[in-house]
Amino acid sequence: MAKRRGLALDGVLLLDKPVGLSSNHALQRAKRTVDAAKAGHTGTLDPFATGLLVCCMGRATKISGRMLEADKTYQAMLQFGEETDSGDLTGHIVARAPDGFAGVEEAALRDVLSRFVGTIEQIPPMYSALKRDGKPLYEYARAGIELDRPPRQVTIRHIELLSFSGMQAQIDVACSKGTYIRTLAQDIGRALGCHAHLAALRRTHVGPFSLDRAVTLEALQAMPDAKQALLAMNELPAGLLPAT
């Protein structure tokens, strides 16, 4: 059977990735829906996370490198009282708050959040795609092996507290490439002395692109002509495409 090739489409699809799908699975579904021959995305979202996945079709894949380097913005829900091995709600609990913990004081939280704004050091999580000896760290983690990881510098542009209930807090975080929001949640919990993990994560911006213009897979598949959802090459923000 001949391999399905698709159309030579050029443009960018702003996809609102659903929970439960890997970024690549979401990309492949979108690629099939618009019938594109060539597609790639510009930065992985964990399966439990939702939000903006910038899918580049055809010649638009030339912007992928710049988008990987771009700042991102996320809305994250922090759950206080428990730390997990993965840093999110999918992992196993590895630490708990002291007995009698009844929630975080808002003033203490605001103080701790302010300490993480600027250039900070993060130790990448074991549950990540970073490689050691050609093997992703998450494969070692799944085998119960913990490796030393050197800290890396990242920049947190801002953290805004959106909502707070004592046991949970929703924050808006703008950050540089390579920032792990799971690690940020873990480090915030440790600084508060109560532990924390991510209960939810939603990406809202990648460089100049916003979730406001994104389409869900369901909406894309319901369109009479899904190709109309693509941003054409001449609609892309100035300066994204490399000079020819």
Swiss-Prot record:
Keyword Lipoprotein among record annotations: no
UniProt catalytic activity: uridine(55) in tRNA = pseudouridine(55) in tRNA
GO BP, sorted A to Z: mRNA pseudouridine synthesis; tRNA pseudouridine synthesis
GO MF term set: RNA binding; tRNA pseudouridine(55) synthase activity
Pfam families: TruB_C_2 (PF16198), TruB_N (PF01509)
Enzyme Commission no: 5.4.99.25
Keywords: Isomerase, tRNA processing
Family annotation (InterPro entries): PsdUridine_synth_cat_dom_sf, PsdUridine_synth_N, tRNA_psdUridine_synth_TruB, TruB_C
Function per UniProt: Responsible for synthesis of pseudouridine from uracil-55 in the psi GC loop of transfer RNAs.
PANTHER family, A to Z: PSEUDOURIDYLATE SYNTHASE TRUB1, TRNA-PSEUDOURIDINE SYNTHASE
Protein name: tRNA pseudouridine synthase B
Organism for this UniProt entry: Bordetella parapertussis (strain 12822 / ATCC BAA-587 / NCTC 13253)
